[in-house]
Structures are given as structure tokens and as C-alpha cells.
Amino acid sequence: MKGYQPETYGERIADVYDELFADVSDVAANVSFLDALAPRRPGRFLELAVGTGRLAIPLAALGHDVTGIDVSASMLAALSAADTDRRVTTVHGDMVDVLPAGPFDVVFVAFNSLFMLADADRQRACFAAVATVLAPGGSFVVEAFVPWDPPRGGPHVELRSMTTDRVVLAADLTDSVNQTVNGQFIELVDGQPVRLRPYVLRWSRPAELDAWAAATGLRLGERFADVRRAPFTDDSPFHVSVYRGA
């Protein structure tokens, strides 16, 4: 998408992110899943693409040492506003090139955020970067959707929300060959200019992630269909993969 930069998504969506994705997952279940991975208390956690702190803040409230990194200053500002007790340490930067010093007991990237890295090379590099800051025997958790099979192609539009004076649409164009989606959240509010919130993602199949992990010395420890540890099957639309450090 012309003009799109790594920080574009967060900068354009931070003000409505929590509203748009309020029901995307069970926060309590996510936090419980992550909490159980800590080998000690408090554990040391790093969240990649921490966003508004949806998971980082309640995880830190359990007493863990939590650091979150995000390329969007606006996302981190929203996190700071919500983190009234200042429990989460934040880092402004890319989740490949500027990871804070480890070792971390658990590194995690939730809600498809790994796919916000523009291409396979950047996603592969993310695994390599995580391997350098993960404690021996630590966990790297990737939560993401399982790509469509067969891949969905072409344009797609769906209604996200509607009130008497506001409509939010999601429009995207999928390239099944390059495994990319270019899209916009389109906000129409009566009497106001149209707001566009663009996003670009490159999806990866679980087998690709497993290969990148193995190449960096990580191994797949467990894979579930969700954070409640439902069994992962060929029909699962999502996966929660736990990679272990050497």
C-alpha cells in the first residue's frame, strides 16, 4: 500500500482500537494462559506489539515484570493513559530491531500481530531476535489465525458496527499468492469527514513459523486452538503456539 509505514496502523487506529477489538478475545483467559507459563514469580515478560496494553496491564497487575514494545507512539500513549499504576515498562521501537535486553521468561505476540511485519523475511527475523532475549527454557507464544484453505482471494467488505449516526466498515484486498492483505477500516460519522485506518498484513502458515523457530534454535512445545488449551486440529481457525528456548 503506497505510503504505508510500519507505524501507520497504530498511529491511525490507536484512538478507537479498544472499541473496535473489545470482543476479540477473552482477556482474562489470555492473561491466565500467559501467567501459567512463568517459571518463577514474578516472571519477566516481553510483549511484542503491546498496543494499548490490553494484556500487558492485567499481566503486570499479577505482579510480573512486564515490558511492552510497539512501533506506534500513539499506541504507547494510550497504554500509558490506561496504566495508572505505571506497572508496564514501554519501549518505542520495532519488534525486530530494537528488542530490550533479556533474558525474558516469556515473550509473546498476540492477536495476529506477528503478521503486521511486512514480509516473511521480517517475520523470520523476529524469531531470530526473540531467540537472543529468551531465557533458557523460556517460552515464545504466537497467537494468530490459521490462513484460509483454500486461500481467500480478491476484495472483501464487512460491516463492523452500526448506530444511528455511525458506521464502521472493513474493506480489504487479499493477494493469495503473496499471502498479503491490504485493508482499511472505514469510519463514517454523520456530519464528519470520513476516517480511514489502513492496515497491511502478511499471513504465515503454522508450518512456516515452525521452520523459522527451528532455524533459530527454538522448538515447538505445544500448540492449542485457543488460550483455553482446546486441542488444535486441522479445522482450527486459530492457533496459540508455544515455542521453547534451548
Predicted regions and their residues:
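C-terminal lobe and adjacent flexible extensions of AdoMet/dcAdoMet transferase-like proteins
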Residues: 206-246
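SAM-dependent methyltransferase
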Residues: 141-211
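Conserved class I S-adenosyl-L-methionine
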Residues: 1-51
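A short acidic, Gly/Pro-enriched loop at the edge of an enzyme's catalytic core
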Residues: 99-106
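A short glycine-rich, Lys/Arg-flanked "PGG" loop and its adjoining helix->strand segment in the class I
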Residues: 124-136
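Class I SAM-dependent methyltransferase SAM/SAH-binding core
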Residues: 53-97
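Residues lining the SAM
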Residues: 110-112
